[in-house]
Amino acid sequence: MFALLLRDGSRKEIEAPDLWEAMRMALRLDALHLEVSGDSPRQMTADQVRRELALDRPGLFDAYAPGWVAPSVEEFRELLRVAELSGSKAGMLVGVSQGKIRKWAGGEGEVPYAVWRLLTIYAGLAEATRL
């Protein structure tokens, strides 16, 4: 059993098949904490959830700057899972073929900043910013 403590102070119980999916739901809903019940109950902060999902690299969700480093294959795949996007849905969202999404998810080439940024905004992990 899992529960989220949301930013408005409310508590929401969620159904998830495992801890990984509960953590993804916590990110999707921008929860402050994820409560994990069971034999050894615990609470995870939003930062701990990002760390566990390997989405905690400094600068990963920042606006573009010279020297920006493209996401790793693992970061890209995890973002697709958090956003609940298939390759075809992600491709339609950002205007590329699903084959291109699959190639990036398979480690062929680097994900362009614009694609990464659109997907992070869609997932709710970054805000649209003005230059």
Task: Show where each model-derived region lies.
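Extracellular attachment/recognition segments
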Residues: 15, 19, 81-84, 89
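DNA-binding alpha-helical recognition surfaces that contact promoter or target DNA
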Residues: 78, 92, 103
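DNA major-groove recognition helix of helix-turn-helix/homeodomain DNA-binding modules
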Residues: 110-131
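Catalytic cores of nucleotide-sugar-dependent glycosyltransferases that transfer UDP/GDP/TDP-activated
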Residues: 89, 102, 107-110
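DNA major-groove recognition helix of helix-turn-helix
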Residues: 94, 104-105, 115, 123
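Short, amphipathic alpha-helical "recognition" segments used to contact nucleic acids or chromatin
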Residues: 67-85
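Short alpha-helical DNA-recognition segment
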Residues: 84-100
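N-terminal flexible/basic segments that precede or flank functional cores
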Residues: 1-69
